[in-house]
């Protein structure tokens, strides 16, 4: 059975998918902490910029960094952006850019659910990996995995490999309201014989 917290996470993203325009492009992954953020990320990083200059920007979910002390500023920037590096790798720049662009293009729809996403607290629950390109934005007949990298949604019938199916990442079947049994996973992957 799913925990109340994971049920809240699932319901939040289910509602999010219901609220966004059906024809919009959903980047994969979607990092919701970038909704409203303005801190620099293309040519520099928050760490390289320093707290004095960083105060001029907005952190995760558009939080104004000006109101925070030097020690509080970095806790209001997403964890993945706190790295002590001068420049982010291109893949990270693209993910941040795509998430911010999605928010800019869909702000009216996203703002209807944003507070619920913010209330999820744990950053991994504030990231959505939609691996169902071209399908309707609906969670019910999909396979959900709660991962450190985010809430991963896959097509029904696409089960993660056994290697990645540790206890913390067991696939959840929303339409059956239960986790997949280990034996089912073995059978799907042809190891039941």
Residue ranges and their predicted role:
Residues 4-7, 11, 192:
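C-terminal peripheral helix-coil segments that are non-catalytic and often amphipathic
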């Amino acid at each position: 059975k799913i925990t109340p917290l994971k049920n809240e996470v699932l319901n939040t993203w289910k509602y999010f998918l219901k609220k966004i325009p059906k024809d919009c492009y959903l980047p994969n992954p979607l990092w919701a902490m970038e909704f409203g953020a303005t801190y620099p990320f293309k040519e520099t990083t928050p760490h390289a910029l320093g707290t004095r200059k960083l105060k001029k920007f907005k952190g995760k979910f558009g939080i104004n960094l000006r109101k925070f002390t030097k020690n509080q500023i970095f806790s209001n920037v997403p964890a993945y952006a706190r790295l002590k590096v001068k420049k982010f790798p291109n893949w990270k720049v693209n993910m941040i850019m795509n998430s911010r662009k999605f928010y800019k293009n869909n702000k009216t729809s996203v703002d209807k659910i944003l507070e619920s996403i913010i209330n999820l607290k744990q950053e991994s629950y504030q990231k959505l990996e939609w691996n169902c390109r071209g399908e309707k934005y609906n969670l019910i007949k999909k396979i959900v995995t709660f991962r450190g990298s985010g809430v991963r949604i896959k097509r029904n019938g696409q089960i993660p490999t056994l290697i990645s199916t540790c206890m913390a990442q067991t696939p959840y079947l929303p339409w059956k309201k239960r986790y997949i049994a280990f034996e089912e996973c073995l059978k799907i992957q042809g190891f039941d014989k």
